[in-house]
Curated annotation (Swiss-Prot):
This is 8-amino-7-oxononanoate synthase. Catalyzes the decarboxylative condensation of pimeloyl-[acyl-carrier protein] and L-alanine to produce 8-amino-7-oxononanoate (AON), [acyl-carrier protein], and carbon dioxide. Substrate binds at R26, H129, T345. Pyridoxal 5'-phosphate binds at G104, Y105, S175, D200, E201, A202, H203, T232, L233, S234, K235.
Amino acid sequence: MTRAGLSPLAWLDEVADQRRAAGLRRALRTRPAGGTAVDLASNDYLGLSTHPRVVEGAVRAVREWGAGSTGSRLVTGNTELHEGFEQALAAFTGAESALVFSSGYTANLGAVVALSGPGSLLVSDALTHASLVDACRLSRARVVVTPHRDVTAIETALATRDEQRAVVVTDSVFSADGVLAPLRDIHDVCRRHGALLIVDEAHGLGVRGTGGRGLLDEVGLAGAPDVVMTTTLSKALGSQGGVVLGPLAVRDHLIDAARPFIFDTGLAPAAVGAAWAALEVLVDEPSRARAVLDNAAALAQACDVPARPDSAVVSVILGEPEVALAAATACLEQGLRVGCFRPPTVPAGTSRLRLTARASLTDDDLDTARRVLADVLTAARR
């Protein structure tokens, strides 16, 4: 049978139609410079992406080191700027060492794959970030996915394994609903069964812990020898990039074995300079972390969410994707930019508005949010 004349991409139209019918098509929305909408959608938790010191940190780095890092960190892309920032962030979080990657996604890929591999066991929470899911798939380890925040299931997987090496991976703060992982209990299980714990602090750094040092710091696990922390520089620190923090032996191993580090161009100087400046602002102004949680509580109250949020994230479940998307659109039309999470990001039937609090929200911003959310959610919940 011949297939001549068939378009190899014809199937894309069919898939697009299916997504459209299910209310799951995605589209890029251009954000204008200096827009007037109140931002409850970005991950700029501390409001540092436009902070004068952070912007100047990026500009200063470009002037000194150029627009790009010019190569892999193993060739020409490793600068004094990269290493200085790594040392500063490690000291801030209580880690022995740090290694910067080009994104939080590649940091998770690099850490999980390089620290597991064939003949090992990976135990992953069912709601970990997509980068951790993909890392597990690429690892060639045996993977056990446990129910969300189920410590008993983690212990069962570790206790019944045949593999010598085991790694448990989890977010510290889960991105869709902002709830916290029971890190102390998970670590106790890992210690009993000789497993390494990898924790993604993307949504914990800058918000939880002493002065925003993260949930690991808050539960007394900062610098633990059997814990590896990953995080992004694109949320609380308002820049871009990712980092793996932990024992020096882990850093040395990743330099040798983490493919997203070895074969990727080093993070651009501007991003490193901005992240370092943001870290310095956080050190100087630790109250920003508290302000995030206070503003999240105000948003939760506006949405009739009963519990005080544990993080910057306030999740308002509306059910079907069309309802959530219409609500997000209505908010934007009234000057409020909110996130909209639909499957496959969240389970079917749980499409939601995802609001993110920022330390820099003003009283006027919160008043606008209360007014718009009251109007939009009343209509959406009818």
